[in-house]
Design a protein with these regions (language model features):
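A glycine-rich, Thr/Ser-enriched phosphate-binding loop motif common to dinucleotide/cofactor-binding enzymes
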Residues: 75-92
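N-terminal basic/disordered segments at the start of proteins
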Residues: 1-24
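Electropositive, gly/pro-rich neighborhoods at or near active sites that engage anionic ligands
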Residues: 31-41, 56-70
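Short, well-structured alpha-helical segments in soluble
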Residues: 41-53
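Adenosine-phosphate binding glycine-rich loop
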Residues: 181-234
Length: 234
């Protein structure tokens, strides 16, 4: 599925200009739209992108006119699967930001069922943290048994009496914790986190997280290349 980009047009230009580009080796169709971005102008660009097979677009940080783009058939690059795949790095960054050593931390993974992302997160976090709690009605017991076989230590079941230092939610949950990171949904809010590449710089004319998600889902990004930072304290 082709990905597009909405970008600010050149100064003194009155026309919307379309051009194929490569962003970190990913092909995109870029629409440069002169400011101010009035709804009619955005719709015109969106319709032209749709005719070229574009359904999802990258936009500048702070873009607030999704209703206009969606009315023309364009949507965002969803980031949920990418964020859940990066849950171990997010968890460790959150603990570091809260000045909690992982080897002394209790972390709970919560979801309606054990997904691939939850299982992989549990396998990576279990040897890193003191206690790993699993809260998943479907598949939770099986995952705990797998962790016991793999690491020889129990992965505990989440319970009201236990107060984890950090809770990672893979689906909407009412469970508590000293710190909660909600990774559920198509586009989880990651206000306290930032993602960067170890050896490359992300372009400044589009939001970084959707770009990373697009690179990851198209197989152009090794998760080992990504670092996660946070100012998450509560």
């Amino acid at each position: 599925m082709r990905i597009g980009q909405i970008a600010v047009g050149r100064k003194r230009s009155l026309r919307i200009q379309f051009s194929p580009k490569r962003v970190l080796d990913m092909p995109i169709l870029r629409a440069e739209i002169p400011e101010p971005w009035r709804p009619r102008r955005l719709r015109r660009a969106a319709r032209a992108l749709r005719k070229q097979g574009v359904k999802r677009v990258l936009v500048p940080a702070g873009f607030a006119q999704w209703d206009t783009l969606e009315s023309a058939g364009l949507g965002p690059v969803e980031t949920g699967e990418f964020c859940r795949a990066r849950a171990p790095a997010v968890a460790l960054a959150a603990l570091t930001g809260a000045h909690i050593r992982p080897e002394g931390a209790t972390v709970v993974l919560r979801g309606e069922r054990v997904t691939r992302a939850m299982r992989m997160s549990a396998l990576k976090l279990c040897p890193e943290v003191k206690n790993l709690l699993i809260a998943a009605p479907v598949g939770g017991a099986g995952l705990q048994a797998e962790l016991r076989r793999e690491y020889g230590v129990p992965a505990l079941e989440d319970a009201p009496g236990r107060a984890p230092d950090l809770a990672i939610h893979f689906a909407p949950s009412a469970g508590g914790g000293a710190r909660i990171v909600d990774l559920s949904g198509n586009n989880p809010r990651m206000d306290h986190f930032s993602f960067a590449l170890r050896e490359q710089t992300l372009p400044e004319d589009c939001e970084g997280l959707p770009l990373l998600a697009a690179l990851w889902e198209t197989g152009r990004l090794d998760p080992a290349e990504i670092t996660v930072f946070t100012d998450f304290h509560s």
